[in-house]
Amino acid sequence: MSARLAVVGGGVVGSIIAWRAARNGWRTTLHAPDITGAGTSVAGGMLGCAGEGRPGEDALLEFALAARDRWPALLADLDASGVDTADIMVAADTLLIAADSSDVGHLRAVVDHLAAFDVRPESVDRDRMRSAAAMLGSSARRGYLVTGEGAVDNRALLAAVRSGARSAGVTLETEKVCRIGDLDADQVVVATGSWAPDLIEGVSVTAEKGEILRLSRPPTAPPPPDAVVRARWRGRSVYVVPRRDGVVVGATQYETGDRDDTAPRVGGVSDLLIDATELMPGLAEYRVAEIGSGLRPTTADGLPLVGRRDRRTVVAVGHGRNGILTAPLTAEIVVDLLDVSSPPSASPWVARLDPRRSA
């Protein structure tokens, strides 16, 4: 009889783990009280490393680059499972933009830093910028194109992975898990993000709140950009990610001491609207379809906590703003760790992401 696995947490990280484990022979139950996937449902879905290449976060950039390389195989596996993936990819490239002289200096520093990791965004003129994003306003002073760093529709992705999981035999349970000791399973994976400390003592994650906007395009408005647009705009960061019916605009980010405080903050929404419509004036013609907010679980060093806590429990939390990007590599590591009878994993990330480093 197959060994029993309980995956607690139904976002994209937990769902991909459940799907991969079931394909590896585990009798898997996915415990997802929030059927929408909580943080996954309010994400931009960017698969970009260049936009995350901040000096001082080298290890996080290395992890993001390693994770990015897993995406073609993930999409191919979904296709091979009979899952329709046509609506998942929404952009293939990323355009990095700066507004004033301070923003240009910041962007140049990021681009120079990326060269050490063999990531070399291409400097583009205004015509090339507008080719990728026709709505760009005249205030955009500098641009770099990152070919091959696109984005997915986060909600379409989660639906596809859940469909693949069901086809692989995963059982979905929506009742909230309060104690992992009560689960009828040989192995347990905890992928509950900011709520992990409720289930496992000593898991150190901090909840950061962020708002996003979903804007729908009326027939008379300009079309969405072809690429992801990530801007340093008058000292703030803003991104615009295309969707087939509009765009996602994001995202604010700040610490919150109250995990129940998930309502969008007026100031954050106002900042996003101002920055997005200055960046792309044509967005003023779009309609506000949704204002969302969610919690991102972060760690002290920026790297997620992925690994064993004991012989029965594996944790996969703390992915911060990179949960979707890094989910395939996280799942690969976790599924490898689940087989306690096999030799230790050769992946260098097993040691670097060890959750005991935060204890």
Where are these regions (language model features)?
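Glycine-rich FAD pyrophosphate-binding loop
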Residues: 22-42
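C-terminal catalytic lobe of FAD-dependent flavoproteins
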Residues: 282, 286-359
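Active-site substrate-recognition segment that forms the wall
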Residues: 16-23, 46, 85-88, 194-311
